Regions:
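Conserved donor-nucleotide/metal-binding helix-loop-beta segment in metal-dependent transferases, i.e.
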Residues: 101-118
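Glycine-rich, basic loop-to-helix element that forms the pyrophosphate-binding segment
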Residues: 65-83
């Protein structure tokens, strides 16, 4: 399998970012690169990123010192252009959980010139859409019912459905 560069900007979202990082490493292993940008956070994100990048050589970090935010789009571009080294790019949010087999499922559908979106599973906080499954496994990382989610994962209807919806997470 080819390695993926996960592109993750974050601002003052440390507990979610840790949860996201841990899900990638736990469920997908260390083959994939994780490129993370801190957008002038004040919650300890930069200090945690410095620590984790010393322990995990597959993590590349960038910091916007601020005081002004740069925003997601600028930081996505920065991470893709200056930090990612793989042919496949996965646009991810700091509050997303990487399911077991996400990488294999992406490569099953990814062809040259296409964009593949993973299905989002989230509680009914936002309007429904074709690209997501509405289900509640907890909103905060400490509330996340991982065991129930993983048990239900294989039973989701339409998990192989192809839609025209596009929203992160997506890979190119």
């Amino acid at each position: 399998m080819k390695p993926i560069s996960f592109i993750i900007p974050s601002r003052n979202n440390l507990k979610y970012l840790k949860w996201c990082y841990n899900s990638i490493r736990k469920n997908l292993g260390y083959i994939h690169e994780i490129c993370i940008a801190d957008d002038a956070s004040e919650d300890g994100t930069w200090e945690w990123l410095q620590d984790i990048s010393k322990k995990d050589l597959g993590v590349k970090i960038h910091r916007n010192k601020g005081p002004e935010r740069q925003g997601l789009v600028v930081l996505y571009d920065k991470l893709v252009k200056d930090y990612s080294t793989n042919d496949v790019i996965m646009i991810f949010h700091a509050d997303m959980y990487a399911c077991p087999g996400l990488d294999k499922a992406l490569f099953k559908h990814l062809k040259k010139g296409t964009i593949v979106c993973a299905t989002r599973v989230e509680p009914s906080l936002h309007p429904p859409g074709p690209e997501k499954i509405v289900a509640d496994y907890g909103i905060e990382p400490e509330e996340f019912d991982e065991q129930k989610f993983l048990t239900d994962l294989n039973n989701f209807r339409d998990k192989e459905k192809i839609t025209n919806g596009i929203f992160a997470p997506w890979a190119i």
